[in-house]
């Protein structure tokens, strides 16, 4: 309130001074000049002033690539493919002012491997409020689309929600969690918004971002990771080309993927299928350390080892990968 009062006072003072100065010149000319300057100043400063007090949609604000890269490298563990592809995809999309379609990413892997976490990182790098932003929209299948008999209702509601929010902010972000629990057919309602149209009913969707999160394909990803491990090869040697084709076909043919026989895949509207590899023992320890730092506690390696040792690993013989990733690290750390 003090800032607004100060602003009002300074405006009144400026008007008073302008009136005194105007008295020394020809009234009409000075009046026009003052009016023009006032209009220009108001036009240039109003938006910045307004956005100090409320969240604004900055569609053309450049992405801080260095900050995103640092966040991905320091906060996401064991996911070299996801880090590389997300950074490349977001940077390229935001730097391209003439994108032909919205950016559409499909993230796949077992629970606890970092899919939700990376969507949070992306949201925070696009909008300071992250997932709490008015321009970031999170849908959870079991919460927002629970009933199979209401598919048509959900499709209509989804279209209206996306249409309304993109018309308000062209660079809105839409995140769909638990795609593997989404009833097939619902997601096809947004197909027109993801296609190569300049506009749909007068609205352009070309600056929007759509992110799908799914456990579907986790078995295919794990098989590839295991094959590399058993061949004595490092997981960092796994490339996107080793997994993306298998993922897209596997998800398309999986009745429990939410993208089963979806036009989004059939029409190649998903830009990247991003695999999240199963996490190893060393990655779980990294998660524990990160959680301890986030809580403001000193890292105790005995506690780190103790928490990691409590996790269960698979396959039965090799015991390489955590079956819950880092998902239960927070709750387990509470008991130490």
From Swiss-Prot:
UniProt keyword annotations, A-Z: ATP-binding, Chaperone, Endoplasmic reticulum, Glycoprotein, Hydrolase, Membrane, Nucleotide-binding, Nucleus, Signal
Catalytic activity, as annotated: ATP + H2O = ADP + phosphate + H(+)
BP GO terms, sorted: chaperone cofactor-dependent protein refolding; endoplasmic reticulum organization; nuclear membrane organization
Compartments where found: Endoplasmic reticulum lumen; Nucleus membrane
EC numbers, comma separated: 3.6.4.-
Tissue: Highly expressed in liver and muscle; lower expression levels are observed in brain (at protein level).
Glycosyltransferase recorded as keyword: no
Signal peptide span: 1-24
Keyword Transport: no
GO CC list: cytoplasm; endoplasmic reticulum; endoplasmic reticulum lumen; nuclear envelope; nuclear membrane
Residues of this chain annotated as glycosylated in UniProt: 64, 165
GO molecular function terms attached to this record: ATP binding; ATP hydrolysis activity; identical protein binding
Coarse class of the protein's main subcellular location: endoplasmic reticulum
Source taxon at top rank: Eukaryota
Positions with a binding annotation for ATP: 109-116
Self-association state and partner proteins as the record states: Homohexamer. Interacts with TOR1A; the interaction may be specific of neural tissues. Interacts with TOR1AIP1; TOR1AIP1 is required for TOR1B location on the nuclear membrane. Interacts (ATP-bound) with TOR1AIP2; important for endoplasmic reticulum integrity.
Function: May serve as a molecular chaperone assisting in the proper folding of secreted and/or membrane proteins. Plays a role in non-neural cells nuclear envelope and endoplasmic reticulum integrity. May have a redundant function with TOR1A in non-neural tissues.
PANTHER family associated with the record: TORSIN (PTHR10760), TORSIN-1B (PTHR10760:SF14)
Family (UniProt): Belongs to the ClpA/ClpB family. Torsin subfamily.
Protein name per UniProt: Torsin-1B
Gene field: Tor1b
